């Protein structure tokens, strides 16, 4: 009798079981490796685009201000030059958008959300250069716009570009890399990797497909884009307000009151954005020449305002630490708030290529600081530091408007490096979100996407109605 099989030892049996378990686990995970590799590539490309865009905007702004500084002693030159330079830069952005890629106008985030549902096209070969150069123009002109919207849209389009270049055919790859690019773009814009992940999972929850592949891809893309950003810009917080004191427990009711105020402000702010967008559509009526002219006037106005009151224009990041430090009186803070609300509505509502994150965060900081100073005056026994309310307000307006409280909380904490304020942030953002929902307000980006899709269907119906009717005439001889 030949011994074809040998008796296994207990150690061998256990090792065999472990091997089978590992093989079953590996076989159960069907994540295509190519998607994860491409997610890393998307993150690198998006990070490089973000760094280039950020530095490009800074360079354009510096050159514009340098030219004005050279003629600062000549009033007859500095005022016309300020208007003309900003007007021309803005007109370049509006022209590129209106003539080559209308979907590159505005924030671009709703376009990515629509693309994730296969409802909006992704023409990356047009959108990336138009958004990049157009954004350099409008943001370089000093308009009240943010850099994060362009970065999110360029990131999402970079994901689709990688899909097309490497001919990835699966719907899973198309969706995962689009979401990866969007998350990587936000991460690179704010040096906030966790907020980038949460933004896609929370804000884009209606469009994002919660699968292991998509989640892994988003994580990898955010990691690589953040590494690229920090390689070029360092690891410091993007908004330096210093370490603020903890919020005492007996002051949490004030943060809840602040959240209630911001809930109402967020609903009103969104409604004003929609009305401003409709107003500009009535002004230009779809004529690109009128749109470019309007953009030039808005850009020139921002150029003049920069000379009169620089805090009323620009993205607002430079204003945030100044306001949070309590360098303005309550009256001046309210004046700046009203002025920036008007300029934000005009610049963003006109369809200029640029985001609204940064202006919104600045508005929240200003109003939050004013509230904090008021509380310090009326409740001196609490020893209130107004800067803590500035930080809470920064996230509260975002939470009320965008309806993504978790993203708002994490985003602000990552940007300011004040993680000890997480409890008042939660109270404020939750209060703002609940009040906004109670008042019937619509999330900003979802509402903009719905309006865009409605216009798309209306245009399609108009084209179909204008097509000549084909009559079925009987054929003779058959």
UniProtKB/Swiss-Prot annotation:
Q: Which residues lie within the membrane without crossing it?
A: 109-116, 177-189, 193-201, 387-401, 402-404, 405-416, 417-421
Among the entry's GO cellular component annotations, what is one? plasma membrane
Q: What's the protein here called?
A: H(+)/Cl(-) exchange transporter ClcA
Tell me the lineage of the source organism: Bacteria, Pseudomonadati, Pseudomonadota, Gammaproteobacteria, Enterobacterales
Residues exposed to the Periplasmic side: 70-76, 233-252, 310-329, 377-386
Sequence motif Selectivity filter part_1, location on chain? 106-110
Short motif Selectivity filter part_2, span: 146-150
Q: Which InterPro entries match?
A: Cl-channel_ClcA, Cl-channel_core, ClC
Q: Locate the motif Selectivity filter part_3.
A: 355-359
Presence of the UniProt keyword Ion transport in the record: yes
List membrane-spanning regions.
Answer: 33-69, 77-100, 124-141, 148-166, 215-232, 253-281, 288-309, 330-349, 355-376, 422-438
Domain of life assignment = Bacteria
Molecular-function annotations in GO? antiporter activity; voltage-gated chloride channel activity
Q: Where is the signal peptide?
A: none
Name the site position(s) for Mediates proton transfer from the outer aqueous phase to the interior of the protein: 148
Site location (Mediates proton transfer from the protein to the inner aqueous phase): 203
Assembly behavior: Homodimer.
Q: What Pfam families does this protein's entry cite?
A: Voltage_CLC
Main location, first listed in the record: membrane
Query: Could you say which residues bind chloride here?
Result: 107, 356-357, 445
Record bears the keyword Signal: no
């Amino acid at each position: 009798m030949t011994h074809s099989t040998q008796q296994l030892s207990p150690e061998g049996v256990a090792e065999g079981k472990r091997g089978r378990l590992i093989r079953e686990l590996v076989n159960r995970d069907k994540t295509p490796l190519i998607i994860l590799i491409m997610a890393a590539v998307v993150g690198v490309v998006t990070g490089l685009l973000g760094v280039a865009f950020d530095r490009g905007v800074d360079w354009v702004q510096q050159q514009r201000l340098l030219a004005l500084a050279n003629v600062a002693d000549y009033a007859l030159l500095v005022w016309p030059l300020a208007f003309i330079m900003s007007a021309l830069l803005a007109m370049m952005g509006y022209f590129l958008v209106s003539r080559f890629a209308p979907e590159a106008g505005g924030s671009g985030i709703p376009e990515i959300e629509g693309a994730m549902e296969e409802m909006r096209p992704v023409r990356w070969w047009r959108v990336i250069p138009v958004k990049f150069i157009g954004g350099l123009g409008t943001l370089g002109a000093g308009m009240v716009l943010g850099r994060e919207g362009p970065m999110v849209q360029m990131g999402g389009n970079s994901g689709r570009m990688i899909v097309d270049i490497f001919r990835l055919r699966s719907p899973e790859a198309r969706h995962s890399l689009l979401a990866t690019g969007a998350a990587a773009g936000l991460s690179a814009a704010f040096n906030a990797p966790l907020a980038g992940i949460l933004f896609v999972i929370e804000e884009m929850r209606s469009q994002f497909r919660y699968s292991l592949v998509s989640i892994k891809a988003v994580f990898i893309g955010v990691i690589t884009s953040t590494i690229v950003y920090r390689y070029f810009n360092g690891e410091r917080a993007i908004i330096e307000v210093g370490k603020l004191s903890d919020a005492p427990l007996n002051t949490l009711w004030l943060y809840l009151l602040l959240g209630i105020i911001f809930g109402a402000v967020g609903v009103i702010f969104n409604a004003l954005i929609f009305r401003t967008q409709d107003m500009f559509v009535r002004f230009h009526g779809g004529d690109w020449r009128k749109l470019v002219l309007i953009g030039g006037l808005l850009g020139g106005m921002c150029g003049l305002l920069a000379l009169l009151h620089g805090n009323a224009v620009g993205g607002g990041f430079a204003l945030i630490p100044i306001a949070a430090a309590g360098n303005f009186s309550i009256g001046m803070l309210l004046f700046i708030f009203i002025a920036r609300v008007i300029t934000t509505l005009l610049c963003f509502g006109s369809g200029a290529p640029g985001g609204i994150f940064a202006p919104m965060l600045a508005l929240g900081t200003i109003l939050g600081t004013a509230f904090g100073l008021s509380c310090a005056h009326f409740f001196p026994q609490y020893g209130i530091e107004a800067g803590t309310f500035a930080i809470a307000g920064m996230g509260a307006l975002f939470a009320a408007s965008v309806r993504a409280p978790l993203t708002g909380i994490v985003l602000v904490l990552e940007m300011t490096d004040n993680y000890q304020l997480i409890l008042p942030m939660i109270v404020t953002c939750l209060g703002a979100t609940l009040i906004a929902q109670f008042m019937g307000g619509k999330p900003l980006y979802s509402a903009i996407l719905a309006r865009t899709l409605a216009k798309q269907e209306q245009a399609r119906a108009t084209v179909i109605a204008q097509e000549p009717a084909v009559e079925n005439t009987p054929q003779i001889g058959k």
